[in-house]
Amino acid sequence: MNNRQLNVRLFGGTFVFNDTENSGDFFSFALDRPTDYLFDYNYYGRSEDSGLFSQQLILAEGGFKSQLEPAFANKWIATANASTTIWKYIMAYGDAGFVKNHGTNAEFVYDSGLRFILVEDYFEIFFPVYSNLGWEIAQPNYDQKIRFIVTLDFK
């Protein structure tokens, strides 16, 4: 297969000083969906917690596709994201990493699934298959676990 791809992305971050753990995770590292307090990303449902726009994915910080707990790290985070071509615009993806919060041990998190690229970097759909939560594809409300990338800001 001539058009096989392997994409690898690494992210690591630590806080030298962070005393905001009592006031929430607004400035913490995100595992799957950054808070975007500087409005750098094109979130269409910026403050949505449920519904279609809450499933929008921005590949930043942890870069995970599944919504796992802990969702944020207020001490440090280290993640790896990878995907490889299965056939044409269908890819398998996998993410793994460690999330550390104050007062708890570092937690290992992982997810995997299928990525359908309709228009690369502009319209992609992610179907989670297996993660820390088990077989996501067999769990209730699977349609709410599907993530997507939509970018209307052309480069």
Residue spans of the language-model regions?
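Transmembrane beta-strands of outer-membrane beta-barrel pores
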Residues: 12-18, 94-102, 120-122, 127-134, ...
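C-terminal outer-membrane beta-barrel translocator/porin domains of Gram-negative envelope proteins
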Residues: 1-85
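Transmembrane beta-barrel architecture of outer-membrane proteins
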Residues: 75-79, 109-113, 145-147
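Transmembrane beta-strands of outer-membrane beta-barrel proteins
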Residues: 6-10, 90-94, 114, 123-125, ...
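Flexible, surface-exposed loop regions and adjacent strand-edge segments
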Residues: 24-31, 107-109, 142-145
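Outer-membrane beta-barrel "beta-signal"
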Residues: 114-123, 142-155
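Outer-membrane beta-barrel strand-turn architecture
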Residues: 1-4, 84-88, 117-122, 154
